[in-house]
């Protein structure tokens, strides 16, 4: 819980970086290009904050390595759409450094053995089979959020995509011989994406101006819960 809390603090803090990157007026490819090939996209915005967050995230590896990896994956997703990418690099670099130091001190032998592993626990490893497995374990939660992303604002989509990265990681990579461990990354994505789901349910609940639309919205919100 402490590791996940620190990851949440880091994600919440870097929201200002995401807002700065998504507030530019450019549209489409020009905006995407400027997120990588301009000075603002890379120059540090707050080095002290990046160092502090990197220190705290690195120390969480002692309690929960999955929370550290999940948090760094989300931050990597946010960094793509943010200004001040060097702050993300500093934060992630320090977090990995402190994590490695702890593993050298407290653990003998290799801690992780990364390998490509497609499909997580899905019996059918085809794309359709994996998507169906995702529906089976989460209902229409994750699939619904991907559809809802079409209607979100630029900054909201950026954060949502970042929050979904741990889940994508769980279906693509295995860090230990036991793939069941990857359920932690699915749960981390679930925890963060739930914030968006709660906001959508709230909007549906409050939708409608006349009586029948209000009650229809409340009924739909109850189903979505």
Segments and roles (model prediction):
Residues 1-37, 56, 193-196:
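Specific aromatic-rich, kink-prone transmembrane helix
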Residues 1, 102-137, 164, 168-193:
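Membrane-helix boundary/interfacial segments in multi-pass membrane proteins
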Residues 47, 90-100, 203-225:
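Signature aromatic-anchored transmembrane alpha helix within multi-pass, membrane-resident enzymes
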Residues 18-22, 28-47, 69-96:
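Perimembrane helix-loop-helix junctions
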Residues 9-20, 73-80, 136-157, 200-203:
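Hydrophobic, aromatic-rich transmembrane alpha-helices
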Residues 81, 89-119, 140-154:
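Membrane-lumen/periplasm interface segments of specific transmembrane helices
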Residues 69-72, 179-206:
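Hydrophobic/aromatic-rich transmembrane helices and adjacent perimembrane loops
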Residues 49-64, 76:
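Membrane-interface alpha helices of multi-pass inner-membrane proteins
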């Amino acid at each position: 819980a402490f590791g996940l809390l620190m990851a949440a603090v880091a994600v919440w803090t870097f929201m200002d970086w995401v807002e700065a990157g998504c507030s530019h007026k450019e549209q489409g490819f020009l905006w995407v290009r400027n997120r990588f090939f301009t000075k603002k996209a890379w120059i540090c915005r707050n080095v002290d904050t990046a160092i502090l967050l990197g220190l705290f995230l690195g120390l969480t590896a002692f309690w929960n390595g999955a929370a550290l990896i999940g948090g760094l994956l989300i931050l990597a997703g946010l960094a793509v759409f943010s200004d001040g990418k060097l702050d993300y690099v500093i934060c992630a670099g320090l977090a990995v450094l402190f994590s490695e130091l702890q593993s050298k001190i407290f653990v003998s032998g290799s801690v992780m053995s990364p390998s490509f592993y497609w499909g997580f626990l899905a019996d059918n490893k085809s794309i359709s089979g994996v998507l169906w497995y995702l529906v089976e374990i989460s209902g229409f939660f994750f699939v619904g959020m991907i559809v809802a992303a079409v209607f979100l604002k630029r900054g909201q989509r950026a954060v949502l995509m970042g929050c979904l990265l741990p889940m994508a990681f769980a279906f693509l990579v295995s860090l230990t011989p036991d793939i069941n461990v990857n359920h932690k990354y699915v749960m981390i994505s679930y925890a963060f994406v739930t914030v968006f789901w709660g906001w959508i349910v709230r909007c549906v609940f409050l939708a409608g101006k006349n009586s029948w639309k209000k009650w229809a919205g409340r009924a739909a919100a109850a189903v979505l819960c």
